[in-house]
């Protein structure tokens, strides 16, 4: 099993102290948490994308590019890229550039996004956001795979033999589909043979387990090999200490502060008490053995091979946050890595034959994903660095005075 640390870059008062950090300090905290994740041995670090208060994660490629410059090993995730709000051409340009700068460490989790305010900002309606997401993804994946793209699109100007640069480093980038509440995202992932990442944050696990069950069903319907399924799952919170009593006592003021924040926004808490939160939510709070057992319970329901933890302290002190993550890597992760399998692909840059995959359908007037023809081509397998094909060059090579560093060893 692989472990990610993920942040949505919430910019709100600390749930315990009530102090809100300056914006630049909050960004600095995100960078520090990414460096800590690499130092401690996490397999990936993810940055969300939201375009409304209280989030300041409106530009994940910029944040991830900065992290890429300061790290060398950890894989870099978006969590999620809101393709329903974005021009897929510009999204491709940003992420292909980031993929080169990071030496092929980029992985995308895509989704339609949440929130009425950001839909209004981008003039997207609840009725068309699924079609926008599906169309943007189809165009995005074609650009990543094909040197020239023609697409009769509905939500952006049509493309005719369009060339988009730079050409990609990974061939192709791995794309996960974020899933929280709807079968549309699940079906889109299954249709293309892409991995699924279940949010598993807001509610008890039952609705998430049902969506994952539906994903597996649709995966087989579309003719993909069941052995190639990959599922990731989130957690609502994390704090481990030597004893469960110590963990619960330390986390109680954090939970109570978060509860007060929810009530101030007029939200009805899903978990009204800390005890209920520890028992029924996806939060991993307790002793190392309790955390191990809870992840196993999730694995029995989800069959997931990637688990994410919250990257932020979120009310814990800096010392508590670091000690808890160190405990995770020293006593929890080694056990889970032995007992839960890895995803069915190599954890590294993806390279395949430079032949475009067959597309399931041209992008014309989008229709619901469930009515589209199945795609039976399997996801391209990763190969070892020794087998890596030479990336296709840009039309003109950079000058000798270029200051860009060479890609990291792959």
Task: Please identify what each model-predicted range represents.
Residues 1-71, 75, 171-173, 346-352, ...:
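N-terminal beta1-alpha1-beta2 module of alpha/beta enzyme domains
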Residues 2-25, 85-151, 195-197, 202-207, ...:
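Flexible, glycine-rich active-site loops centered on histidine and acidic residues
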Residues 3, 37, 41, 49, ...:
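Conserved, mostly hydrophobic/aromatic
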Residues 3-5, 45-47, 76-79, 106-110, ...:
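Hydrophobic faces of well-ordered beta-strands that scaffold small-molecule active sites
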Residues 5, 9-10, 127-164, 205-305, ...:
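An alpha-helical appendage that flanks or caps ligand/catalytic pockets
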Residues 13-27, 81-89, 171-181, 279-288:
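Active-site mouth loops of central-metabolism enzymes
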Residues 44-67, 82, 114, 200-203, ...:
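Glycine-rich, proline-tolerant flexible connector loops at the mouths of alpha/beta enzymes
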Residues 54-78, 132, 136, 326-340:
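Alpha-helix-loop-beta-strand connector modules within alpha/beta enzyme cores
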């Amino acid at each position: 099993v692989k472990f990610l640390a993920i942040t949505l870059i919430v910019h709100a008062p600390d749930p315990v102290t009530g102090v809100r950090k300056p914006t630049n300090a909050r960004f600095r905290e995100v960078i520090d948490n990414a460096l800590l994740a690499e130092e401690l041995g996490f397999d990936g670090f993810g940055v969300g994308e939201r375009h409304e208060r209280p989030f300041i994660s409106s530009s994940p490629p910029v944040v991830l590019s900065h992290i890429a410059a300061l790290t060398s090993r950890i894989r870099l995730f978006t969590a999620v890229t809101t393709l329903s709000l974005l021009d897929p051409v510009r999204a491709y340009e940003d992420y292909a550039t980031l993929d080169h700068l990071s030496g092929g460490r980029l992985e995308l989790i895509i989704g339609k996004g949440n929130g009425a305010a950001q839909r209004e900002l981008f003039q997207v309606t609840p009725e068309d956001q699924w079609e926008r997401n599906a169309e943007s993804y189809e165009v995005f994946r074609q650009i990543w795979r094909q040197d020239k793209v023609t697409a009769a699109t509905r939500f952006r100007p049509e493309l005719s033999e369009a060339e988009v640069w730079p050409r990609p480093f990974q061939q192709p980038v791995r794309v996960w589909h974020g899933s929280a509440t709807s079968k549309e995202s699940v079906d889109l992932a299954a249709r293309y043979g892409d991995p699924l990442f279940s949010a598993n944050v807001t509610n008890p696990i039952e609705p998430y387990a049902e969506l994952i069950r539906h994903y597996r069903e649709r995966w087989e319907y579309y003719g993909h090999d069941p052995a190639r399924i990959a599922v990731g799952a989130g957690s609502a919170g994390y704090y481990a200490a030597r004893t469960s009593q110590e963990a619960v006592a330390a986390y109680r003021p954090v939970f109570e502060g978060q509860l007060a924040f929810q009530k101030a926004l007029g939200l009805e808490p899903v978990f009204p008490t800390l005890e209920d939160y520890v028992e029924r939510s996806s939060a991993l709070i307790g002793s190392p053995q309790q955390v191990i057992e809870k992840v196993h319970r999730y694995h029995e329901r989800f069959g997931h091979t990637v688990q994410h933890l919250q990257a932020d302290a979120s009310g814990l002190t800096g010392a508590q946050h670091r000690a808890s993550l160190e405990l995770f890597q020293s006593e929890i992760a080694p056990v889970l890595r032995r007992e839960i399998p890895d995803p069915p692909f190599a954890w590294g840059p993806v390279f395949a034959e430079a032949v475009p995959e067959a597309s399931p359908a041209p992008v014309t007037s989008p229709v619901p994903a469930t009515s589209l023809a199945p795609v039976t081509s399997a996801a391209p397998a990763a190969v070892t660095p020794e087998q890596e094909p030479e990336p296709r060059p840009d039309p003109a090579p950079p000058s000798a005075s270029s200051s860009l560093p060479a890609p990291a060893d792959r």
